[in-house]
Amino acid sequence: EEACVREVAEGRPVEIGRLQRFATDTMMAKEGHPYGRAEKTGKRVAVVGAGPAGLACAHRLAMHGHEVLVFDARQRPGGLNEYGIASYKTVDGFAQAEVEWLLGIGGIKLEQGTRLSGGLDLDALIKDHDAVFLGIGLAGVNALRIEGVDLQGVDDAVEFIADLRQAEDLSDLAIGRNVVVVGGGMTAIDAAVQSRLLGAETVTIVYRRGRDRMSASRYEQDLATSKGVRIISHARPVRVIGNGAVREVEFEYTRDGAGGLEGTGETFRLAADQVFKAIGQTLEGAPDALRFEGGKIKVDESGRTSVPGVWAGGDCASGGDDLTVTAVAEGRDAAEDIHNAILVGQEEVNESSRPGNEPG
């Protein structure tokens, strides 16, 4: 919406998100499924990860008549939509309603509580299926390597958001009086705003670069400040202070130097009885047989990995922009390529075109 020309001409963009939500809700409210399923092909595809990319891939493959088995590490499908969107941004049950609607096409089975390297073996999946799609997301969290991060009250923001989404009563969740959030992305904004809504007296987001470098949109930043969240830029954490539990966080002001970000030597402290780390997520549990790029699974434009018969998409794959809509598109496009490969006979790919096997 920020790129909409009406934002400049009229000061308000076309509200694409709300239009899509209305269209989706209207379609899901109707009886029956709008997409027909093709005649069964007898082909079986394994999808690992029941997030936006995995579910989009499974749905498109089912449309083509293939049997799809979806594995997911968590007890409820939905991925980011179920565990990663703050409670104040959504309504209860929407993610599960979408999953049920997707499964309505038929031909898709879910198996919960199973993850790669923890019960699932990639070689076995390849052997037992005609193709494998990996949509495992980013399950790891970047480490904050400073003194005091092991103190009570220092938590991962992604786990906080997940706990909120699964809680039956938000009032049962303990929240600090003075909350500090380290990071500059959407998760940082969500943790900060949700903390204010749950009753925190002061909430401060601290980001190491300027606000123009925050990955959270300006709209999200303004939303946070409108809720009483303070944003401090050009500062990085030095240490967490406390005796068993966090009491303060010490920060150092930063500046952009010739060699990159550098500290100025000037420090300050913020009172805190709860600190949320929101400094990014990492790939976790991906098989070593795959090739990687920038900390993600390396794929080509069709989602093919370096391992024959294995595709990947969504946040776990290289080249994306970490948006849900992009993950859905990558899952859908990979499904089309999988369909062609296993049914039309295009599974033989020139090794020189595979990621990581370029000549020279």
Task: Give residue ranges: language-model regions.
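FAD-site-proximal beta/loop scaffold in flavoenzymes
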Residues: 150-176, 259-322, 337
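Rossmann-like dinucleotide-binding cores of NAD(P)H-dependent redox enzymes
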Residues: 67-70, 74-104, 108-112, 192-239, ...
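N-terminal Rossmann-like FAD-binding beta1-loop-alpha1 element of flavoenzymes
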Residues: 43-69, 187-196
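Feature captures the FAD/FMN-dependent oxidoreductase FAD-binding
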Residues: 39-40, 44-48, 96-147, 239-250, ...
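A conserved FAD-binding loop/helix module that cradles the flavin
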Residues: 191, 316-345
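Glycine-rich dinucleotide-binding loop and its adjacent helix/turn
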Residues: 23-39, 100-113, 118, 141-198, ...
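Residue-level detector of alpha-helix initiation sites
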Residues: 51-52, 76, 185-187, 317
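Iron-sulfur cluster-binding cysteine motifs and their immediate structural context
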Residues: 1-23, 69, 73-76, 107-108
